[in-house]
UniProtKB/Swiss-Prot annotation:
Residues 19-33, 47-66 have a biased composition (Polar residues). One of its GO terms (cellular component) is extrinsic component of mitochondrial inner membrane. Lyase that catalyzes the C1-decarboxylation of 4-hydroxy-3-methoxy-5-(all-trans-polyprenyl)benzoic acid into 2-methoxy-6-(all-trans-polyprenyl)phenol during ubiquinone biosynthesis. Its EC number is 4.1.1.130. InterPro entries: Coq4, Coq4_euk. This is Ubiquinone biosynthesis protein COQ4, mitochondrial. One of its GO terms (biological process) is ubiquinone biosynthetic process. The lineage of its organism: Eukaryota, Fungi, Dikarya, Basidiomycota, Ustilaginomycotina.
């Protein structure tokens, strides 16, 4: 090694005598290597293939390179920002014209829920029951609920009162459309749980499925969950109640003719229902907003574990006070085309079918005897 360095020393010159240094370097002795070094080819796409979820289209299109799908992303209907705005406006106007359109309500809930999803997710993660819901993801419908068992509970229990409320209002938990616009499993379950819990809010707030009751519940949801769909529905319900109240007023022509004839203006024996709803709404809105802002996050409640609990105890625990006035119960929906308008109720259909089966079985037993 010393001989090599000694022979190489006069070849590498410094200072002013190094003008031919580049040519002298070619005469340096070469050292043979035992393993040839091969340089691996490097391409711009080798970094993109590190992530197994990165689409190949993002390697060629730099505009989509920053968009990587989440691991829990599910099949959904893709929408752009402009598309969501148009769907929000269209579904809101459609619901204002016909509030019984459940498909429009589901669409409005999904396409407008973007700003509030983080708040809902934070509310569920803040409690142990909410975190358990996000892991187990149970559902409330006629296939997961033992209707016969809940109907056998004594009055005052949450499960029994829920069944009685369904009977009184002619509704059920199965009229919920799929959340086809949500991109991830987590967001899809948030919307599903929000919609499945809506009837429980009615029950705890003592509100029927009427125009007044629905509007009050939407004000409650707006104060507690900041859901845009709750704001749209609350504003739409208020406008409809206000329009009904204005239409019940005497026409100007009637007032003028009554004044000219010096006859008393037409009076009703009692206050019209529309005017009564408007007066009740003015009283119930502050109460609903106050209860919504002070009660516990109901989105994280495991209703499946509350069937046998006392409903009044639950109201005290959730800090839900009684309404300042009593709201009239549901008296049935108007019929259109010979059919009653309303949400489908598979629970009531199940009870009716079971009753018919029992009657048929009794007839069979009697015929055998």
């Amino acid at each position: 090694m010393t001989s090599i360095l000694g022979s190489a020393r006069p070849l590498i010159q410094v200072g002013p005598k190094s003008r031919n240094a580049s040519t002298s370097m070619s005469r340096l002795p070469s050292f043979p290597t035992t393993r040839p070094c091969r340089r691996a080819p490097c391409s711009s796409s080798s970094y993109a293939t590190i992530s197994p979820t990165a689409p190949r289209s993002s390697q060629r299109n730099p505009t989509n390179a920053s968009r990587h799908p989440r691991i829990d992303e599910v099949d959904h209907i893709p929408t752009s920002a402009l598309g969501r705005v148009l769907l929000t406006a269209g579904s809101a106007l459609g619901l204002l014209n016909n509030p019984s359109r459940g498909d429009l309500l589901s669409m409005l809930t999904q396409v407008s829920s973007g700003p509030s999803l983080a708040h809902l997710l934070e509310s569920m993660r803040s409690t142990e029951s909410g975190r358990r819901l996000l892991i187990e993801r149970p559902s409330v419908n006629s296939e997961t609920v033992d209707v016969d068992y809940l109907a056998s509970l004594e009055r005052g229990k949450f499960g029994r009162e829920w069944i009685e409320w369904l009977k009184d209002n002619g509704v059920g938990p199965d009229g919920r459309a799929e959340a086809d616009y949500m991109t991830t499993l987590e967001h899809k379950y948030l919307i599903q749980r929000y919609r499945e819990s809506h009837d429980f809010y009615h029950l705890l707030l003592r509100m029927p499925v009427t125009q007044l009751g629905e509007t009050v519940v939407k004000y409650f949801e707006l104060a507690q969950m900041n859901m845009p769909v709750a704001g749209f529905a609350a504003a739409g319900g208020t406008l409809r109640i206000l329009a009904s109240s204005l239409s019940a007023l005497p026409k100007p022509s009637q007032l003028i003719s009554a004044a000219l004839n010096r006859s008393p203006a037409p009076e009703t024996a009692h206050q019209p229902p529309s005017s009564a709803d408007l007066s009740a709404l003015q009283t119930l809105i502050p109460w609903a907003m106050q209860v919504g802002s002070s009660s516990v996050p109901l989105i994280s409640i495991e209703w499946e574990r509350c069937w046998e609990r006392d409903i009044e105890e639950m109201r005290r625990e959730f800090r839900i006070t009684s309404p300042p006035i009593q709201v009239a119960k549901f008296s049935g929906r108007a019929k259109k085309g010979g059919k009653r308008r309303g949400w489908p109720s598979k629970i009531l259909e199940h009870q009716k079918a079971q009753h018919q089966q029992q009657q048929q079985q009794q007839k069979v037993d009697e015929s055998r005897n």
